């Protein structure tokens, strides 16, 4: 007797967005849970998404002269304590190695939650002249932060990321680098992930522990909650002063270096899922999809059909990530399976279509089917993929714009917040920000570079100093 | 005043092999030390070597259907204890997370020294039928082992590696997979690293904790010491029984799966250095070299020379990893610098050569210089690189063969061992192996599939059961 497995259905996103999300993560086989809470297993299909992000960034880094390195997983507690804001921000969630199977360690070791202190210590050793600058290092690695509430990809005790750490002779150069990184992330969103972001500066309250300026890209999920998807920090000379990273400049003066750090993580995969997918499962934009095209013979035992399917597979496989499914399962099962997995294009090869010189192509992003001539469809594929990518980006962009409001009164702010999405308001500063967070649960996402909406802050009635985009967020 | 830095010289390998090795690691800027002993920083030039090994293996894995995944950094102590031999082998050197910045953990967590238990636990959850088999997973990651004596690349508390973990329905299939992996490593050595290995089974004493069979590739360093450079394990049903990984076979019987695991690490980079380099520094085989060709204009301010150098650079950069050095430093300094860094080919562009329509090409592996027509040299480069690679492999192979001896008496064994390198002897088993290790410091590297040299073991005088290749090793 055959064990027949049905393709598993996902929960409706309208009935339970959180369950819908974890259903997709698990049922599309992106991840599995391990036995330690907050640590997930990246399965082949999920890990391939991260590999494609890495490839995209590595390609860009090669053009800009950023070099990959690998710094240690651990550092001493002493090192951690050198920059005060930084340790205050990260210490509570840092994991410690205190012993081995055999004995206690003399000194506790911190597992990196981020690596500013390691890079700073190294830079202090090797930088002495303006000729040693800039240094443009990046590493892909795992980091550990002991988060309480965890959710696959979005927040884990361990996650995978890329962290850039650069050192410059001047403030201007470091500020340019900070902007370079956040613009690179915007480009990554636009070109690979089909994700539009709101990009801007973080408020004093929300900026990175140890930074002077933090820029962030923020994505808006389908449930109207925001997600911080990447950050870029101008560290000024904070770490340089704590670690004594000095250089002799061309004018013979000893000066502190200016530093930046910036990162995106596997969290981007969470955004990808939450922005694009539907109740049938995952919907992947074509350029990041591990399988871009799946070929399904409708009568797999029909020799003509099988031969044609193989021919098309061989034709396409040099250009695209393509999969030919010859499993002994029904076409219906296979359709559901690859819809669940969000494969952008499905080519159905059927005897009837072939008799008419045609194939059927299904597009996952709008669940549409069209017939194409089997002799000419190949030339259409680049256009199809491009259109799918563009439409997915535009749809997400439209959702973002439709859920971006502004408020002139605190009541209006609260009313807008009920509708989910972003609300802009001009505020007096951190006091207003804290009050808003306590009373509404919304946090400052980014500062907008736009004129004030109201001269006074609707929350404190003090003079407004900046317009800030608020939202509830993951 | 300019600060003039000399290219740093390395210690002679004949006077102090250990110092020569670490000099190259540090001065060729492959690594730097961190402040925690045993944890090293992989600098761009060193990390690029590992990236090229990863690319090679990923390309091969794609052909064979091995899929990349990422499993957690940690697991529970309970999980660790499930396979008895395994925990006995790895427990003493396992690092533990016991607390965070805020509080003690309820349960100690083990940082992976290797991930058999994590994969086994996952496989137990997802495998139920022969249709679920095989699973061919691989991960690139960091692992932690609390080694006492550490040496860059060769032995560290943290290292980077690739670990394959596969599951099969039959013993035969798993044994084939075990051999597939070790043969892949031999191919990697032959095609990318120009490293010949002795390949064979480990003795019972030396095999992996938890395995039935371990195959190993062993490289021979220039000082005559062996280095285990990669291993592949047939785990039998050991882990399957401990973790209850069972499947219903086509004959409806429930059976335990057969597993394999196999890995190579950044240790390969240590072998690369110790086998190929000389007293001028690193010598890199061309296909793994991060910079394959460096172009040095001898009169960088001469416009003709500069234009020609740039033209050649543009010509070559689409095909090779090529670097044009326009720094304001003397050609002599640059020559030493790239010799220290082991760049396989140096193209010198000089006014006098150009007047005769020529360029000079320096080959690092034999420190030879030849003139080539500047119009035709480009076509010679693939041949040059291939020849360099082949000659480097042959030289290492010759060294290996010249240092491989056999012994019919224990005294002969000891005499041969004085000359360094490998000594084969037919032994009675583990008792002889232990005696040899205690008395001579040599360990069993691999079992040879050759006829017995002597009917009795020269050490114990008992009946010999196998011929084993011994050596002192790293």
UniProtKB/Swiss-Prot annotation, chains A, B:
It comes from the Bacteria. Homodimer. InterPro entries: aa-tRNA-synt_IIb (IPR002314), aa-tRNA-synth_II (IPR006195), aa-tRNA-synth_II/BPL/LPL (IPR045864), Anticodon-bd (IPR004154), Anticodon-bd_dom_sf (IPR036621), Pro-tRNA-ligase_IIa (IPR002316), Pro-tRNA-ligase_IIa_arc-type (IPR004499), Pro-tRNA_ligase_II_C (IPR016061). GO terms for biological process: prolyl-tRNA aminoacylation. PANTHER family: BIFUNCTIONAL GLUTAMATE_PROLINE--TRNA LIGASE, PROLYL-TRNA SYNTHETASE. Consists of three domains: the N-terminal catalytic domain, the anticodon-binding domain and the C-terminal extension. One of its GO terms (cellular component) is aminoacyl-tRNA synthetase multienzyme complex. It is found in: Cytoplasm. Catalyzes the attachment of proline to tRNA(Pro) in a two-step reaction: proline is first activated by ATP to form Pro-AMP and then transferred to the acceptor end of tRNA(Pro). SMART domains: ProRS-C_1 (SM00946). Belongs to the class-II aminoacyl-tRNA synthetase family. ProS type 3 subfamily. It catalyses: tRNA(Pro) + L-proline + ATP = L-prolyl-tRNA(Pro) + AMP + diphosphate. This is Proline--tRNA ligase. It comes from Phytoplasma australiense. Keywords: Aminoacyl-tRNA synthetase, ATP-binding, Cytoplasm, Ligase, Nucleotide-binding, Protein biosynthesis. Its EC number is 6.1.1.15. Pfam families: HGTP_anticodon, ProRS-C_1, tRNA-synt_2b. The keyword Flavoprotein does not apply. Signal peptide: none annotated. Its main location: cytoplasm. GO terms for molecular function: ATP binding; proline-tRNA ligase activity.
């Amino acid at each position: 007797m055959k064990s027949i497995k049905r393709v598993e259905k996902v929960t409706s996103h309208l009935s339970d967005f959180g369950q819908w999300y974890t259903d997709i993560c698990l049922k599309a086989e992106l991840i599995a849970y391990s036995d330690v809470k907050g640590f997930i297993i990246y399965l082949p299909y999920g890990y391939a998404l991260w590999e494609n992000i890495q490839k995209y960034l590595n390609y860009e880094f090669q053009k800009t002269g950023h070099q990959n390195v690998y710094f240690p997983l651990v550092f001493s507690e002493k090192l951690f304590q050198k920059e005060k804001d930084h340790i205050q921000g990260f210490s509570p969630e840092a994991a410690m190695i205190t012993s081995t199977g055999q004995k206690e360690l003399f000194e506790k070791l911190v597992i990196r939650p981020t690596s500013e202190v390691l890079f700073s210590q190294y830079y202090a050793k090797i930088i002495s002249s303006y000729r040693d600058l800039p240094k443009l290092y990046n590493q892909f690695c795992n980091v550990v932060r002991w988060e309480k509430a965890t959710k696959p990809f979005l927040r884990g005790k361990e996650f995978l990321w890329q962290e850039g750490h650069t050192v410059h002779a001047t403030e201007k150069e470091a500020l340019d680098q900070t902007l370079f990184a956040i613009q690179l992330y915007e480009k990554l969103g636009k070109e690979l992930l089909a994700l539009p972001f709101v990009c801007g500066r973080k408020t004093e309250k929300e900026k990175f522990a140890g930074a002077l300026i933090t820029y962030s890209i923020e994505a808006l999920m389908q449930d109207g909650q925001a997600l911080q998807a990447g950050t870029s920090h101008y560290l000024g000379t904070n770490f340089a002063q704590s670690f004594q990273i000095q250089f002799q400049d061309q004018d013979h003066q000893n000066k502190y270096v200016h530093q930046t750090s910036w990162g995106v993580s596997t969290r981007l995969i969470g955004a990808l899922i939450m922005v694009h997918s539907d109740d049938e499962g995952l919907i992947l934009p074509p350029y990041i999809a591990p399988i871009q095209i799946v070929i399904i013979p409708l009568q797999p035992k029909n020799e003509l059909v099988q031969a044609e399917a193989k021919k098309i597979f061989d034709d396409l496989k040099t250009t695209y990530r393509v999969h030919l499914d010859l499993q002994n399962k029904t076409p219906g099962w296979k359709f559901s399976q690859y819809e669940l997995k969000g494969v952008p294009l499905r080519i159905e090869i059927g005897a009837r279509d072939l008799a008419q010189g045609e194939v059927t192509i299904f597009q996952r992003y709008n669940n549409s089917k069209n017939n194409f001539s089997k002799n000419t469809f190949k030339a259409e594929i680049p256009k199809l993929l491009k259109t799918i990518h563009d439409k997915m980006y535009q749809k997400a962009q439209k959702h973002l714009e439709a859920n971006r409001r502004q408020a002139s009164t605190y009541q209006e702010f609260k009313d807008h917040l009920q509708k989910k999405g972003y609300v802009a308001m001009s505020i007096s500063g951190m006091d207003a920000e804290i009050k808003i967070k306590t009373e509404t649960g919304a946090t400052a996402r980014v500062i907008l570079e736009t004129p004030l909406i109201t001269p006074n802050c609707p929350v404190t009635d003090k003079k407004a100093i900046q317009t800030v985009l608020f939202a509830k967020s993951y």
